[in-house]
Amino acid sequence: MSEFKRLMRLKLKMKQKRPEFKRQDSHRFQRIGTMWRRPTGHHSGQRIQVTYRLSPVKIGFRGPALVRGLHPSGLEDIIVNNVKQLAALNPKTQGARIASAVGTRKRIEIVKKANELGIRVFNVSKQKQGEFLSL
């Protein structure tokens, strides 16, 4: 088993054990979102790290450095806006994610070109890719 595969498996296990970092009192008030904010209150149980409160973000929860930030498939996630940017990708180490601002017509062109070059597109389902390729 290669070191890379071992680290990817370790990353997955660590992710499963990692707690969900939520903003303090986000379950009590609808106006407060769940996105993490560091608690700053003087008597805040979460800030003091009382056992029964939610866990705060700590450096020990990070994943292995070599595979940090990679897609679960092990490929580097690159945002693509046009076909030119797609040509610059390496299909063995990088995958494409089509930017949200890209319209349907250009999205179809990108998916077709990615299929020709053998590049994986992360945010287009296999079913949708089949529809795009048949057009």
UniProtKB/Swiss-Prot annotation:
SMART domains referenced in this protein's UniProt entry, alphabetically: Ribosomal_L32e (SM01393)
Q: Which GO terms describe its biological process?
A: translation
Which family is this protein grouped under? Belongs to the eukaryotic ribosomal protein eL32 family.
The Gene Ontology CC terms held by the record are:
cytosolic large ribosomal subunit
Keyword ATP-binding listed: no
- The source's superkingdom equals Archaea
Question: Pfam families from the xrefs?
Answer: Ribosomal_L32e (PF01655)
Question: What is this protein's name?
Answer: Large ribosomal subunit protein eL32
Give the stretches traversing the membrane.
none
Q: Which organism is the protein's source?
A: Methanococcus vannielii (strain ATCC 35089 / DSM 1224 / JCM 13029 / OCM 148 / SB)
Q: Name one GO molecular function term.
A: structural constituent of ribosome
The gene is rpl32e
Keywords annotated in UniProt: Ribonucleoprotein, Ribosomal protein
Q: Which SUPFAM superfamilies match?
A: Ribosomal protein L32e
